[in-house]
């Protein structure tokens, strides 16, 4: 009924404001569902509101907040109206039908989610899900007013929604708009890390372990890949918000998926003064992007670009095409750090092209044991422009993901 991550990304809201919008939508939807239940066309307003709201929210325009309110309220109204019907929970036969309906619905949901995520958040499958939801509400819509024993659920849900809205409003008023930041020193530590949305090598989910791995290197800048802002398949948590708050670092978001909930991110203790996003035009499986930020340091500014190139072993041509787009996106800005999972080993044409463009591989002097992926390859890189001095590079021996983080200590050119 409401995804705080989607509300933050599509409408540009902070978490408390996102929770406020969704809470008001839920409360309004429950009230609307109670009023419409029993009318033969009562499903129509909820259908129109949810459909129009999804369209507005998906566009991410200035109408996104209104879209979130409408979609949440419309969906909640349809659910409330159906659940208030006399056909729900009346006798053993009715219970069996409801249980079967829920079971089939869950199976259908899993199938749709699988297709949705393999298409990297395609709106097509969201539309299919909306059609199925509204069709089900139309078929199951109650034909008469709910009985008196059904009504108490209405004020309870309404009060709960209002309380959520009030709590979110209070949090919005008392929380700072941004975390504190200061110019970085002339010597900094940079990390690149594919966090697999917080899942460790043994598939155990723990963002706390992810945070501890990052803390072990005490980095000034962290470039992250496979960051989820609320995908259900990745536990529904907003990885970026949680890690930013937990580590006390500024966050920049670079979505790759169409819905804006999965992609790359950059955390920094410095002040971010510019941010740019590039979406690659070619991809073989999941959509990919690159994120660039300009971070202020004591004697100048540093550009940091994070990316995650295509994964399949047979996608070499696609990765080369993505590298050409990446180099055009970089456009020679210096000094620069380009970091991320490139899905190419040293000596691959992808790495050769980046070195040919003048970049330096900070891990070039590492031994063959310095692998970064679970299958024993070095495919995660920290590349720098030649005016940056590489003081140290290492791979942390920690498996809080299916990748190990790469860390480098760098001296900025103005420190010479």
Summary of predicted features, one role per range:
Residues 147-150, 158-208, 212, 216, ...:
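N-terminal signal-anchor transmembrane helix
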Residues 121-123, 170-182, 202, 221, ...:
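Structured beta-strand-rich core segments of catalytic domains in phosphoester-bond hydrolases
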Residues 1-175, 294, 333, 344-416:
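Metal-dependent phosphoester-hydrolase catalytic domains
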Residues 286, 315, 415-416:
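C-terminal luminal/periplasmic domains and tails of membrane-associated envelope-modifying transferases
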Residues 199-200, 229-233, 259-261, 312-314, ...:
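Active-site environment of divalent metal-dependent phosphoester hydrolases
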Residues 188-195, 206-236, 254, 267, ...:
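Active-site beta-strand/loop signature of hydrolases that rely on acidic residues for catalysis
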Residues 9-15, 197-199, 277-281, 308-315:
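Surface-exposed cleft-lining segments at the edges of enzyme active sites
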């Amino acid at each position: 009924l409401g995804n705080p991550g989607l509300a933050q990304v599509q409408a540009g809201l902070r978490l408390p404001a996102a929770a406020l919008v969704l809470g008001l939508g839920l409360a309004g939807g429950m009230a609307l569902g109670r009023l419409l239940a029993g009318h033969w066309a009562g499903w129509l307003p909820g259908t129109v509101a949810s459909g129009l709201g999804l369209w507005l929210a998906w566009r991410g325009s200035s109408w996104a907040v209104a879209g979130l309110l409408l979609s949440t309220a419309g969906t909640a109204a349809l659910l409330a109206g159906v659940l208030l019907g006399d056909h729900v929970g009346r006798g053993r036969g009715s219970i069996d039908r409801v249980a079967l309906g829920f079971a089939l619905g869950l199976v259908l949901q899993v199938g749709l989610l699988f297709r949705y995520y393999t298409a990297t958040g395609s709106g097509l499958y969201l539309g299919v899900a909306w059609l199925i939801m509204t069709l089900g509400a139309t078929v199951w819509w109650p034909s008469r007013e709910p009985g008196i024993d059904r009504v108490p659920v209405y004020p309870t849900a309404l009060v709960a929604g209002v309380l959520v809205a009030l709590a979110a409003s209070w949090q919005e008023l008392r929380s700072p708009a941004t975390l504190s930041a200061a110019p970085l020193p002339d010597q900094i530590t940079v990390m690149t890390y594919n966090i697999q949305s917080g899942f460790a090598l043994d598939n155990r989910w723990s963002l706390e372990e992810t945070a501890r791995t990052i803390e072990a290197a005490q980095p000034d800048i962290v470039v992250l890949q496979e960051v989820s802002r609320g995908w259900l398949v990745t536990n529904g948590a907003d990885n970026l918000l949680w890690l930013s708050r937990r580590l006390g670092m500024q966050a920049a978001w670079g979505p790759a998926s169409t819905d804006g909930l999965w992609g790359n991110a950059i955390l920094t203790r410095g002040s971010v003064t510019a941010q740019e996003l590039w979406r690659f035009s070619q991809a073989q499986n999941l959509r990919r992007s690159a994120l660039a930020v300009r971070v202020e340091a004591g004697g100048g500014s540093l550009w940091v670009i994070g990316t995650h190139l295509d994964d399949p072993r047979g996608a070499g041509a696609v990765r080369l095409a993505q590298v050409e787009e990446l180099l055009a996106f970089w456009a020679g800005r210096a000094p620069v750090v380009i970091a991320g999972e490139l899905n190419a080993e040293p000596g691959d044409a992808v790495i050769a092209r980046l070195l040919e463009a003048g970049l330096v591989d900070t891990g070039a002097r590492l031994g063959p044991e310095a692998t970064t992926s679970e299958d024993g390859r070095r495919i995660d890189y920290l590349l720098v422009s030649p005016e940056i001095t590489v003081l140290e590079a290492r791979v942390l021996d920690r498996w809080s993901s299916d990748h190990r983080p790469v860390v480098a200590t760098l001296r900025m050119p103005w420190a010479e």
